[in-house]
Amino acid sequence: MATAAQRRFCRCACFCSQNLYVARYGLHLRFRDEHQLRRDYGQLLRSRGCVTSKDFQQLLEELEQEVGRRRRLGQESAVRKALIASSYHPARPEVYSSLQDAALAPEFMAAAEYSTSPGADLEGLLQRLETVSEEKRIYRVPVFSAKFCQTLLEELEHFEQSDMPKGRPNTMNNHGVLMYELGLDDPLVTPLRERFLLPLMALLYPDYGGGYLDSHRAFVVKYALGQDLDLGCHYDNAELTLNVALGKDFTGGALYFGGLFQAPAALKETLEVEHVVGSGILHRGGQLHGARPLCKGERWNLVVWLRASAVRNRLCPMCCQKPELVDDEGFGDGFTREEPTTVDVCVLT
C-alpha cells in the first residue's frame, strides 16, 4: 500500500472558495467576492438573521479570514508538525509505537480477518457487525479496547494542555487534534486503514471505492461545555468515514443521519445514533449527518475520513466537478495526478 512519502497527494482548488461554514447561520457558503456573496446568498442570509450592514460586513470579514487560513493551511500545518516532532514530550509514548493487536477490540480484528479470508462475502461480514441502518448502510463495530481508549485520551489531553501549536481538526470544529501533526498518522492510523479498514470497507462499500482506499485524514474532535457543543449538518470530504467514540463520561451528543447529500429531501427522515465508547460508526462520506448538543461532560471522538483517489480523481465530492489539483502536504485531500484505476462507483447526479 502506498504512503504519502511515496506518492504526491493534492487537494482541489475549491477548498479555498467552497463549503465555507458559518455556524451562526447554519450555512455552508461558496465565496469569491462581496458581489457574488450578495447575489447568491443575499435573500437566504437575511432569512437566517444576517440583516444589517454590520451583520454582512462581519460575515464578509470572517469569510475572507477563513479563505486566508485555508490558503496557508498546508504550509502552517507542516511547520506545526515539525515543531511538535522536535519539541513535544509525550505523556504516553507507547501510543506512538506501531499499532498493536492488544489495542484493538477482538470483534474488530475478527471482522477484518474474516474479510480477508477466501470466500468472504457481505452476508458473512454483516454477521460480525451491528447493522445500525440497512437502508442508510450504517454499521457499528467495537474498534479499540477500553485500555487503549484511556491511554490515547491521556495522551491527547496532555497534548491539549501543552504549549505546542494546535491546528483546527477540520473546517467546522474548533477543538481537537490533527493526528498527522501529532505524529500519529504513521504508527496508528495508516496501519488501521491498510490492515483492517480496507478489507472491511471493500466488502461493505465496493461501490464507493471501499477496496481502493489509499489515503485518509484523521483527527480527534472534542466537545465540552464552553467549547464546541454540537455540530451542524454536513457531509464529509471522504468516500467513507469511521467515527470512534473514545470517551469520556458524557450525556447527549448523539449523531444524526439523513440521506445522501445529492438526494432530494435528504434530511426529511433522520436517524439518531448514540455513541458507544470504543466502538466505531462506519458510514458513507456523502451521508448528511451532524451531532446533537452535548448535555454534560466531555466527548472525544476519533474521526477518520477514508479516501480513494481512484474515485475522487474523477469528481471532487465538495464541488462536484473534476478536481482542479493543487499540490499539498501529507495525504492532502486524497487526490493524485495519476490516471485513476477504473472503478465502478455509485454517483448520484
Curated annotation (Swiss-Prot):
What Enzyme Commission number(s) apply to this enzyme?
Answer: 1.14.11.-
Q: Which PANTHER family match?
A: 2-OXOGLUTARATE AND IRON-DEPENDENT OXYGENASE DOMAIN-CONTAINING PROTEIN 2
Q: Where is the Fe2OG dioxygenase domain?
A: 214-308
Binding residues annotated for 2-oxoglutarate, in chain numbering: R299
Record-stated family: Belongs to the OGFOD2 family.
> How the cofactor binds, per note?
Binds 1 Fe(2+) ion per subunit.
Q: Where on this chain does Fe cation bind?
A: H234, D236, H289
Keyword RNA-binding belongs to the record:
no
Highest taxon of the lineage: Eukaryota
Q: Name one GO molecular function term.
A: L-ascorbic acid binding
Q: What is this protein called?
A: 2-oxoglutarate and iron-dependent oxygenase domain-containing protein 2
Q: Which PROSITE patterns does this UniProt record tie to the protein? A: FE2OG_OXY (PS51471)
Cofactors named for this entry = Fe(2+); L-ascorbate
What's in the keyword line of the UniProt record? Dioxygenase, Iron, Metal-binding, Oxidoreductase, Vitamin C
Enzymatic class:
oxidoreductase
